[in-house]
Amino acid sequence: MGDNIVINLNNVSRSYGNVKVIEKLNFTINKGTINSLIGSSGSGKTTILKTILGKLKQDDGIVQVFGKEPCGKGSEIPGSSVGYAPQDVCLYNEITIEETLSFFASIHRMPKDEYIKKRDSLVEILELPSLSKIISELSGGQQRRVSLATALIHSPKLLILDEPTVGVCPLVSSKIWEHLIFLTKNFGVTIIITTHYLQECRSCDNIFLLRNGRILESGPPNYLLSKYECSLLEDVYYKLCRGDEEISLQLIDSKNNEKINRDINTSIPLEFISNGANINNDDILISNTNKPIIKKDAKIYKERLSDFKNKLQIWFSHSITISIRKLTQMYRLKFPLVFEIISPSLLITLFFLAIGNVPHDLKFGIKNIDSGSLSGDFINALSDGNNIFNFIQINDTSNAIQMIESSDLWGLIDIPVNFTNGMINKLFNPLEKSFENSEMEIYMDLSNFQMNLMVDVQFQKAFNKIANDSGIKLLPTNFHAVYGDQNANFNWFLAPAMICIITYVHCMNFLSITFVREKNDGTRDRILLYGVSPVSNVLGHILAHIPILLVQFSIQLLIAVFAFGVPIKGNIVLIYLFFILINTVGMCQGILISLISKAEVDAVQLCLAIFICSLCMAGIIWPTEAIITFGWISNLVPTKWSGLALRGIMIKDLPFSHQHIWKSLIIIISYIIGTFSLIVISTPIGDRNFNFKKLFKRIKK
């Protein structure tokens, strides 16, 4: 009997919060039978299917499929032993029918000739439209048939079909049922379906009638019709629901609140086990046995798991398959693809145009009543070779101050009488003369720190130029450039890190939205159910995104170098290496964000929060050395290290042996390993919707 049992549920319960969805459920399903779960919405059908598939963890009881707990050691679930067609079609809208079937065949590692043979057979049975049609162009019924084809393509031992014939014409529905019966009779395939069309269930070997998470009755259709003296299964279900409702009312009205044993005796008289109306119900056995059945015939699966080399090959094969599918999806969406490639370049161009440049055309008032030439030389030095200042002659100081207050002027330079003589006396006879008339008065709006700093620098440069032209050295210092250039501008500092963070957040946002969509539309869980590991799924998306990253980065570098003069002095290979690594961190963080986000807007908001934190704490626009109180936080931001390394390579030509380079590389790789590990730990299908209340109860015990 153990070899014949495919599914065994023993006292299984499952809750969502305080609501019991299924309670003390007991049933077994035998090999080579078609079994139908019948019940209204909320009766627990989908929860039972998800528990069997390992997508939900039961609160209590034992669930065994092929003799093992789903997702447990040695289990065939997840894997290719099961075929699943969910109620939501869970297909990729951007690819064709052929690409869809080929993708799932590759996931199951089917030989090409076997795939073609099975594909052609399913096209005929399910009457699929042209294989070149894109999924989004199909009707709902056509999409459901394609979904069913993906569940059948690899010839699984267990088929779980949720509403497989909804929206399908009666003729095709009849052919589907004929094929399902053929599979059970000739290949011993076990099938579980849910449906609202009770008359379809006349072809089933077994029917389970559910209400409020309990089995009201089960058995072959003719047995149920005979037992309850009905001509239609709808009438049988109606009688059972009415009886169950009356028992519930009696229980509520009972003063003693006596517990009523409502377990159904599902043993069936032998005369109903084989009958003409039930097409293929040979050797059906319904049992509520509590004895765990352990199937020992899992040799091939155990050998594959124990062979690490083969496991790596499977991971690699799945990763390549997913990356090809993802690239195909992106290629089909032309506008999003172009936007994905161009938008970082547009942002970096906007950044270069708006940030880091020296201001120009600043209106400054000049009140110059100096009789000497030094004041004129100073004004000429300020205007020499640039258009930073736009000088306006002013005669009245108070009037100029009013213009500054009304924002008509940035400032006023008030040069006193005999300024030239005063400066000469200050420099050459400091003890003989006072410093009167040796200082000019500057009136400015000092609320703009950055602008004040730039103006101050220009004034100092002008005085140094006058002094140097006269052979006088004002400052007792000589600056020598060990790295960089004295003519470097602020963009040299900003560009390497800014290019990084733009693409970093772009990748994070793109991957988080992608994974939230795949999580919500069911496509992610579907491939995980077929044995695709979280490692392969993540690697597949990362591999698909790397070609786009390389194009993005190349365009940004060309813009930075040829349009805005940012130098690249170091090893270009190291530059690309750090760029790919930091964006891999961004992609992994995006996937991690998707695991805790219910909707795309949640993921976008989290990405925006990380972007703001990185912009402020990573030393991108201001040195991290200026962060005094919480400076240690900047060490936790990965873009700090990529910016540090890229500045070192691009501007300083630092070798790999320099501590800024190899330390940054180790830290970024550690981030990748850490986030990747969190994804792998958090994603496994068996841990979804885990009941933490039960876990805490066990801890207390």
From Swiss-Prot:
Membrane topology reported for the UniProt record: Multi-pass membrane protein
Origin: domain of life: Eukaryota
Stored InterPro entries: AAA+_ATPase, ABC2_TM, ABC_transporter-like_ATP-bd, ABC_transporter-like_CS, P-loop_NTPase
Keyword annotations: ATP-binding, Membrane, Nucleotide-binding, Transmembrane, Transmembrane helix, Transport
Gene3D superfamilies tied to this protein: abc type-2 transporter like domain, P-loop containing nucleotide triphosphate hydrolases
Family: Belongs to the ABC transporter superfamily. ABCG family.
Full protein name: ABC transporter G family member 23
Organism of provenance: Dictyostelium discoideum
Upper classification of the organism: Eukaryota, Amoebozoa, Evosea, Eumycetozoa, Dictyostelia
Gene name of the record: abcG23
